[in-house]
Amino acid sequence: DNSATTRTFPEVAELMTKIMCEDYGNPSSLHMKGVEAEKYLRYAKETLARILKVEERELLFTSGGTESDNMALIGCALANCRRGNHLITTQIEHPAILQTMRYLETQGYRVTYLPVDPCGRIRLEDLRRAMTPETILVSIMHTNNEIGALQPIEEAGALIKQMNPDTLFHVDAVQGFGKSRIYPKKMHIDLLSVSGHKIHGPKGVGLLYVGERVKIQPIVFGGGQQQNLRSGTENVPGIAGLAKAAEMLYSHFDEDHARLCACKRRFIEGVRELDQVKVNGLLPDAPYGEGTAAHIVSVSFAGVRSEVLLHALEDKGIYV
C-alpha cells in the first residue's frame, strides 16, 4: 500500500542515522556542529530546487503534507484577505485540504467545491465559471490518492493566470511528487505541497514551495527560522532524508515510470479475467490506465465487501 506510506530507502535511513548520531547540531548554532548541520540543509535545498527547477529561497520545510497544505491555504487566505475572500477547490481533495477549507469558511471565507467527471478530473469550464474577481486562491490536487486521477494542472494554472494573474494556485502534490515530473514555474503553480514518507523518505517531514511573488502569513511563530515563515529548529535528519529520497527517485525516474506502467497494464489485464470486476477512473479510449497515475489502480468487486477482501489479501502478505 505505497499510497499510504512507503518503506524508507536504506540509504536514506543510513544518512539520517549519521546526522542523528554524529552531525546532530542545531543549524542555527555558530559553532562547528551547527555549521555541519547547516550543510545538510543547504544540500537539501540545492537538491530539491534542482528537481523542481525553482529557487532555493522558495522552499520551506514543514512537518509533512498536512502542515504544508494548512500553511498554504491559511497563510495565503490571511495574507490576501484584503483582495478578496473567495477560494476554490475540488470535491475529491485530501482531508488536509477539505477540512482546512471548512475551517476557513467559519472565518468568513467563501469556498467553491468543484465537481469532477466520471474519471475523477475537473472540467476546466467549471473552473472558469467559478472564478470571480474575489478569488484569491485555487487549490487542486495533482494526483488523486484513491483512483489515480491526474488533474490537468498546467491547463488549470494557465486558465487561472489568464483570468486573474493575482489569483494564487496551490497544488497538493503529496501523491504526485516522485511519480510525475512537476515543474511549478512551467505549470503556473504558486504553492506546492510535498511529503517525505510518500517517496521512500521519513515520516514527519514535508516541503512547501512558495513562489517568490506569493504573499503568505506564517501560522507557526517562534524563533524566526526559514525567513520568519516557519519557526522552529529545523528537522535536519528528516529534511536531508527527504532530499536524499527525492534524489534517488528522480535519478532513474524514466525506467521506474515505464516499469510501473507495465505493471499496471499487467494487473488490469489480470483482474479483467475475473467476473463482476470494474476498474475505476479510466479515461475514454485508455483501457489500461493511460493518462492516470502509474502507481494507482482502483478496482471494485461486485458483491464483495472491501474490508473482507482487504483482510483476505492481508493473509497473503498483500496490503491494499
Language model segments and positions:
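Pyridoxal 5′-phosphate
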Residues: 2-320
